């Protein structure tokens, strides 16, 4: 049995949360926004980070060691543009990844496949 006194004395993160997106070539996340900032940092591969500036879509390409921060309320997405699977680290403000707000074009495309957005911003099958 594990000794509880040997457990690390680290608390939960406060003020931010992070995770990793491991994606095959051509895959990533569609346009969405959070009620927090979001920072992207590739661990490997080459990534397209794209966002909406009004009606115009803008894009930057990142590789390992690069970083970009996207402000609150800006639609953003990412895609692995490498020729092999790659990993992207993301950090968001707040203690969780925050509710996702999908771009209307993403919701329209999802509905055509039988999906709908639930109260948490998740795309779910319509029953």
Where are these predicted regions, by residue range?
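Glycine- and acidic-residue-biased ligand/ion/polar-headgroup-sensing regions
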Residues: 25, 35-48, 52-53
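Short acidic-glycine-tyrosine-enriched beta hairpin
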Residues: 53-72
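A short, N-terminal "cap"/entry segment at the start of jelly-roll beta-barrel domains
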Residues: 1-15, 119-127
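Short histidine-centered beta-strand/loop micro-motifs
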Residues: 6-11, 29-34, 51, 59-61, ...
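Histidine-centered metal-chelating micro-motifs
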Residues: 27-30, 48, 67-68, 72-77
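His/acidic/aromatic-lined binding-pocket segments of jelly-roll/cupin-type domains
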Residues: 20-21, 31-32, 37-42, 60, ...
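Conserved short histidine dyad/triad with adjacent acidic residue
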Residues: 2-6, 17-34
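Double-stranded beta-helix
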Residues: 75-127
């Amino acid at each position: 049995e594990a000794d509880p006194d040997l457990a690390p004395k680290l608390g939960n993160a406060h003020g931010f949360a992070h995770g990793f997106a491991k994606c095959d070539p051509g895959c990533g996340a569609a346009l969405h926004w959070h009620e927090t900032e979001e920072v992207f940092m590739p661990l490997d591969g080459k990534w397209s980070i794209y966002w909406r500036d009004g009606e115009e879509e803008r894009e930057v390409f990142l590789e390992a060691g690069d970083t970009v921060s996207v402000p609150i309320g800006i639609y953003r997405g990412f895609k692995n543009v490498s020729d092999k699977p790659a990993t992207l680290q993301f950090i968001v403000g707040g203690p969780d990844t925050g509710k996702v707000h999908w771009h209307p074009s993403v919701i329209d495309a999802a509905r055509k496949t039988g999906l709908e957005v639930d109260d948490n911003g998740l795309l779910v099958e319509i029953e």
